[in-house]
Amino acid sequence: MTNIRKSHPXMKIIXXSFIDLPAPSNISSWWNFGSLLGICLALQILTGLFLAMHYTSDTATAFNSVTHICRDVNYGWVLRYLHANGASMFFICLYLHVGRGLYYGSYMYTETWNVGVILLFAVMATAFMGYVLPWGQMSFWGATVITNLLSAIPYIGTNLVKWIWGGFSVDKATLTRFFAFHFLLPFIISAMVMVHLLFLHETGSNNPTGIPSNMDMIPFHPYYTIKDILGLLLMITVLLMLVLFSPDMLGDPDNYTPANPLNTPPHIKPEWYFLFAYAILRSIPNKLGGVLALVLSILILIIIPLLHTSKQRSMAFRPLSQCLFWLLVADLFTXTWIGGQPVEHPYIIIGQLASILYFSIIIILMPXISFAENHLLKW
């Protein structure tokens, strides 16, 4: 009699995806983040679902409903802070996951990579809309500033912004639709994750050497299930430390003030995970230029497979490319810091230099250094 795991149609999919999946024997902990992202998504959907049971998406009651969740709902404060800090963990894992892909050349699986970039956009959109829902000062003004950027689009911009707002300013209609989309998008993301995995399982995983590992594969379970559980324990530990000891560390104090259209906060800034993009947006003293730079800062990931000039896939054996990669990481940290600073000297020029360096590394320096490395190795 055949094992039900291998014969039952639904079980077969799970068996082939998480149990008998052939995986390279040498993938490091950098390959943990895929499963961690899946767990983050599940956690966000669950906590979000329970929060939505008590939240009201009306400008008059939104702020108070969030306060009510924290004060009156059983363990409502745990739900809220798990959801808010879970988003931070989600983005930490996302950026590490993308960084791993860049370092080890995983982007050569173009279908998987492109679906991943679309997923990144979808998660960023979801997080932005979620930040608007508590209807604090930073929620309101963040929504106003970011949606207003669309008015830079020639000809249709102004009408587009009013259409998104559902009126002449960010108001009740805006909040209601943001809640609707914030609820809907994670389920679309879940479906896209399945497409992401479908494309990945067509090729199998990459590995740190960037050399095909078809001759040395091991089953996913028990080796990588156990390895992933270690990563999960570490992530849950960090998340619980955040939630239980300093739940507001990554938030903005301004968001504890109810939204007031008549009073602008002195420094409007997004959550920490958008600060690098915000710095790139602000570094260009032109509205349309800034918006284009903002979109391109993420969209540039799509063309990375086209910019790969090296004969080697991974950066593991390319010290010059490694130096550039870590320079890029340092540059992103710099821009994250700049995004949270006021628009004044010397922050303006630092932000502009960081933005120029960001695009230069990806478009010019990386391909050129890879090309030079080929010649150094006489390839």
Curated annotation (Swiss-Prot):
Gene Ontology process terms (BP): mitochondrial electron transport, ubiquinol to cytochrome c
GO CC field: mitochondrial inner membrane; respiratory chain complex III
Residues that, per the record, bind heme b b566: H97, H196
Main subcellular location of this protein, as a coarse class: mitochondrion
GO terms, molecular function: metal ion binding; ubiquinol-cytochrome-c reductase activity
InterPro entries in the cross-refs: Cyt_b/b6_C, Cyt_b/b6_C_sf, Cyt_b/b6_N, Cytb/b6-like_sf, Cytochrome_b, Cytochrome_b_C_euk/bac, Cytochrome_b_N_euk/bac, Di-haem_cyt_TM
Cofactors, names only: heme b
Subcellular location: Mitochondrion inner membrane
UniProt protein name: Cytochrome b
Phylogenetic classification of the source organism: Eukaryota, Metazoa, Chordata, Craniata, Vertebrata
Name of the encoding gene: MT-CYB
